[in-house]
Amino acid sequence: AKLIQRANDILIQSLRVRLFPVTAPPQPVDADFQLRARLLEARDPDLFERDPAALLRIFIVYAQHPELAGFEPTTLRALWRNTIHIDAAFRANPAHRALFMTLLRQPVGITRALRAMHRYGQLARYIPAFGRIVGQMQHDLFHVYTVDEHILTVLRNVRRFTVSTLAHEFPLASRLIASFEKPELLYLAALFHDIAKGRGGDHSELGMIDARRFCRQHGLDKPDSELVAWLVEMHLVMSRTSQKEDTSDPEVIAAFADKVGDPHRLAALYLLTVADIRGTSPKVWNAWKGKLLEDLYHATRARLAGSDQAMANIAAKQEEARINLALYGLPKDAADALWQHLDARYFMRYSVRDIAWQARMLRWRVTSPDAVVRARLSPVGEGIQVLVYTPDRSDLFARICGFFARIQYTILEAKIHTTRHGYALDSFQVMDLANRGIHYRDFLSFVEYELARDLDPARPIQPVPRG
């Protein structure tokens, strides 16, 4: 398929030049290349045979000129014909290795240049391990791209974090990468994170070995090489932890923080993880997964900063929540009646938005003998968020889960907390996976009323439908 694609490109460009000949003189770029009608052209047809380093330099020039639409057909044919010169000796040449790293350090055009290298065969020749996964399908429920396309999509996603005009898409990722001194390390991790798929064995460990070797060969010092290798080895850990473990559990956060080690690695892993999930399929990423990752990042960051920083973060959350409550005309002490019964773990688990909402909903019900149920549209993504506050008892969780099972709603997240005075303060993120088109305003009232009825201890536990 790639061969057909390359031949097709050459044919189309050749026909375009013949049908629409360019009369304007070319614009010189340097001693080797020039621009002709938005196409990049080698000034000497024998350039690549005479100077094989130009096989890499042409892509640096291509990255530096975003106005270019492609390559002049004669140059494209010469590029394709001379790709055979990218062999073991070529890859071992320090000058060529320096050129590849220069490409990865360009301020713009990196993704476009690497996609062109892939399209015309140079990337697979320069990184043989990449050549082995070209066109390789991934037989799982999530990946919709071949391994090579997935890798380049992940790299593109990392690059998008650096674009200031797109900062609104992922504000945290944008802030983190802006302070990342060497973003090329992230690009290398993206290139190698799945490069060992299909070999047998753990592709994370095999890819780590490839990445470490490549980095050391390309002049990266040991700390930088180890960071890239570590990212490749650990690239699945953050997503698994955020989606499969209780990240409100301090022991889970402590274990994850031990694996990460320091804030710099945490930031790098977060950036790669977000880019990786988004590059799996257009349907896999959602706002809920984004929130899980952000929560894990912030909790781990606080853990790495130490207990003093954690307490400072709690105080900051409380102050911000008070400001939020003031927007509803509530006094500064409106939350005190509830907060006096809550420990530090509660404030570490919840966002400011959730803390303020729960305080507002429970202000006059802190010692209510009856169950309090409040529901709202989820502030992150689809579905609804349900707050349950009631004197704690042993059958409470079973009753709540049974209710959502009966109305055919899936529980995406459950946060269970017990106050100092013996009340359960539980929060549920639920979603109608069947997309039945329910009118949410009426449905929120239904949940608040019916779930509160089901939690009446005088009522028997309702049966859960089977099948």
Spans of model-derived segments:
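Short helix/loop capping segments that flank catalytic or ligand/cofactor-binding pockets
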Residues: 50, 66-70, 124-127, 163, ...
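Active-site-adjacent "gating/activation" loops or surface patches in catalytic cores
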Residues: 27-41, 50, 119-139, 145-190, ...
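Divalent metal-dependent catalytic cores for phosphoryl transfer on phosphate-bearing substrates
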Residues: 1, 6, 146-147, 173-306, ...
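Conserved catalytic alpha/beta cores of large enzymes that bind or transform nucleotide phosphates
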Residues: 83-104, 159-165, 177, 215, ...
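Short acidic (Asp/Glu) and glycine-rich catalytic loops that position anionic groups and cofactors
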Residues: 34-39, 76-82, 91-97, 129-137, ...
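Non-catalytic interface/linker regions that flank or bridge core catalytic/transmembrane domains
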Residues: 1-143
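Regulatory modules associated with amino-acid/nitrogen control
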Residues: 1-44, 110-112, 120, 251, ...
